[in-house]
Each structure stands twice: as C-alpha cells, then as structure tokens.
Amino acid sequence: MAFDECIENPAPYKYVKDSCDRTYRWLVRCKKEMERLNSLDDTINKNQMLFGINQGGTFDDIRIEHMQRIAELDLPGYAIGGLAVGESHEEMYHILMLYFLMHL
C-alpha cells in the first residue's frame, strides 16, 4: 500500500480535502518509484503490488473524487482507509455502501 495520511475524526472539510490531495501525490510518487525499481535488472521481486488507499473522512464528495482520481492510476487493488476510527456505525456503513455502489 502507498503512504496515506491518517487524520483524526472528525476533521474539518478543508483539512480532509488537503489530506486526500497529499495522499494522492504520495501514491503517484510511490507508483513511479515502484515502476523504476521494477525496471532494474537486480530487482528481486517484480511481482509486488501497489494498492491505493481511498480516503475522505465522512465526506461523500471527497471520497468519490479521491476514488476516481486513484482509479485512473490503474493499480492492482484499492483499500478503504479512514474507517472505524471513531465515526458512528451508521457513518461507517454509509461509506462502505457508497464504495460498494461505485463499483457495481
């Protein structure tokens, strides 16, 4: 998995948005570095996979935008981050359903 910023919950909208932007930049850097390392002859395991981590707190619009951005990187897998960190069960299940519906 790529680096991501684990923010507190709840967090202000702007901070969550900025954090997602930062996490996306880290993911792009991780992908480039992994591609560089896998191009080397002496790389031991070229089959490692890089997963992107979807963040966005409990803000639907940020989560959707962040997932769309990281999906464009065409990674082998994705994870849902920033859940079960203090939000209500209702909020957690809402985010899981949002994620699930985006991928039907």
For every predicted segment, state its role.
Residues M1-T43:
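Non-catalytic, usually N-terminal nucleic-acid engagement modules in DNA/RNA processing proteins
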Residues E33, L37-D41, N45-L104:
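Glycine-rich phosphate/ribose-binding loops and adjacent secondary-structure elements
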